[in-house]
C-alpha cells in the first residue's frame, strides 16, 4: 500500500526531527539541536552576536529564531492530518504544538507580542525581536486548531 509506505516515512521524519529539534518542556521545535540552543544567560545578553558584531535582537542563529513560525506551520499541518485520520496521536501532537505557541505568546507577559521562541532550558527566556512571519504562521496555526 503506497499510503502505508508514505505514512511510515512521514512518521520516521517526525520521530527523527522530534528527537533532535523538539523540547517537551516548551512544546516547540527549534532550528538547532535543542542541546545547542544558547543558555538563558546568553539570551539575556542577546548572544550569539551577529557576524558583524551587532546585537542579535531576533536571536538569529540561536535555534530559537523560528519556533513560532515552525510551530504554526506544523500545527496547521497537524490539523489537516487530523481532519483525515481522526486519530488520538495527531490530536495529542496538535495539542502540544498549541501549548508551545501559547507559551511563546504569553511567557513574557507582553500582551500582543509573539516571541520567536523560548529557551528550552528555563522555559521563559526570549529574544526581544519578532517578525510578521512569526505572527502570521503562529496565528494561522492557532486559528486552524
Description of each model-found segment:
Residues 1, 72-87, 137-145:
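Well-ordered alpha-helical scaffold segments within catalytic/enzyme domains
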Residues 1-66, 96, 100-117:
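Low-complexity, Ser/Thr/Pro/Gly-enriched N-terminal "stalk/linker" regions
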Residues 9, 93, 130, 134-137:
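Soluble or luminal CAZymes and related metallo-dependent hydrolases
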Residues 13, 17, 70-73, 77, ...:
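Alpha-helical packing segments of well-folded alpha/beta enzyme cores
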Residues 55-74, 122-134:
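Solvent-exposed loop and edge beta-strand segments that line ligand/cofactor-binding
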Residues 79-80, 84, 88-126, 140:
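Active-site-adjacent structural elements in enzyme catalytic domains
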Amino acid at each position: 500500500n503506497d499510503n502505508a509506505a508514505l505514512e511510515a516515512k512521514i512518521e520516521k521524519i517526525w520521530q527523527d526531527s522530534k528527537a533532535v529539534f523538539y523540547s517537551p518542556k516548551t512544546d516547540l521545535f527549534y532550528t538547532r539541536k535543542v542541546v545547542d540552543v544558547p543558555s538563558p544567560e546568553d539570551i539575556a545578553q542577546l548572544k550569539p552576536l551577529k557576524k558583524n558584531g551587532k546585537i542579535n535582537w531576533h536571536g538569529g542563529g540561536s535555534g530559537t529564531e523560528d519556533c513560532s513560525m515552525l510551530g504554526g506551520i506544523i500545527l496547521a499541518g497537524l490539523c489537516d492530518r487530523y481532519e483525515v485520520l481522526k486519530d488520538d496521536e495527531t490530536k495529542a501532537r496538535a495539542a502540544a504544538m498549541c501549548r508551545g505557541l501559547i507559551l511563546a505568546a504569553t511567557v513574557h507577559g507582553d500582551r500582543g507580542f509573539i516571541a520567536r521562541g523560548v529557551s528550552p532550558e528555563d522555559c521563559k527566556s526570549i529574544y526581544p525581536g519578532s517578525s510578521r512571519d512569526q505572527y502570521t504562521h503562529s496565528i494561522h496555526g492557532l486559528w486552524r486548531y
